[in-house]
Amino acid sequence: MLTVQELVDDNADNIPFNWIAGHGAADRAIPDDGMAAADLVGHLNLIHPSRVQVFGQEELAYYTRFDLRRRMHHMDELLIGGVPAILLADGLSAPQDLIDQCDQHQVPLLSTPVAAAQLIDLLRIYLGKKLAPTTTVHGVFLDVLGLGVLITGESGLGKSELALELISRGHGLVADDAVEFSRTAPNMIEGHCPQLLQNLLEVRGLGLLDIRTIFGETSVRRKMRLKLIVHLVRATAQDKFERLPLQDITQDMLGLPVRKVMLQVAAGRNLAVLVEAAVRNTILKLRGIDTLGEFMERQAMAILQSSK
């Protein structure tokens, strides 16, 4: 649950707020209810009273042109609708009746010198990230050739060793062991590392390694977009993998399908090279190049020509 006070504190660097009224309602919650960030804050709108209401110059001019009785009526509609906070943009001064109403009903009233349109944009970006669906996944998250790659698999398969090999080849570490993912946009999942584990990689026999100190600043990343999941599995006689799968394998992550590659762990296999190859192939597919599809077309043409 996000409160008005948290919103003010988290945006103190970009949006300087000044409390005008409703100081006792700092813990007032901003309702989420699964709504998009665009629906949680916007210009004054009586049809959507339950969002953070922003008064710009036009909205304040609209409000002040009415008599006191009409203003009270509009404020009652907002209050009944459960308005979480009222923000005055552009450094505007609040009318005394608005201050009195907010104090009486304990609704936070704040002002800021930031322009109304910019204020709404900043808060929508903030709310979109703050209230995004999140999950924590066990694995290692890396930047491989500019692509966010999550390495998963059961314990003891060498995920951290593989990550260390990739880092030594010039790729970057985002998070190890516990990776926090959030769906920050309808078609985008971002992954980052918890503050406690930043820059750290745990390798059996070596313990904790500070990757940033060992390999330098360019060896770590703050966050990446998830594009590929590489799942490591033990190589057993019972496993039967399709050598040429006709359909891409995907895994659901926060409601989005993410491309997935299965790699068998066996003696003599260079997994780092295989991961790089999988990433390069994924990049080609994102560009619309389907190697298997082109091969099947070539094969079909060869069969057609040989049958003539």
From Swiss-Prot:
Q: What biological-process terms (Gene Ontology) are attached?
A: regulation of carbohydrate metabolic process
Region (Important for the catalytic mechanism of dephosphorylation) residue spans: 264-269
SUPFAM superfamilies, per the entry: HprK N-terminal domain-like, PEP carboxykinase-like
Which superkingdom is the protein from? Bacteria
The residues the record assigns to binding Mg(2+) are S160, E202
Q: Which EC number(s) does UniProt give?
A: 2.7.11.-, 2.7.4.-
Give the span(s) annotated as Important for the catalytic mechanism of both phosphorylation and dephosphorylation: 201-210
Q: Which reaction does it catalyse?
A: [HPr protein]-L-serine + ATP = [HPr protein]-O-phospho-L-serine + ADP + H(+); [HPr protein]-O-phospho-L-serine + phosphate + H(+) = [HPr protein]-L-serine + diphosphate
Oligomeric and partner information = Homohexamer.
Other information = Both phosphorylation and phosphorolysis are carried out by the same active site and suggest a common mechanism for both reactions.
Tell me the protein's name.
Answer: HPr kinase/phosphorylase
Q: Which organism is it from?
A: Bordetella avium (strain 197N)
Question: Which gene name does the record give?
Answer: hprK
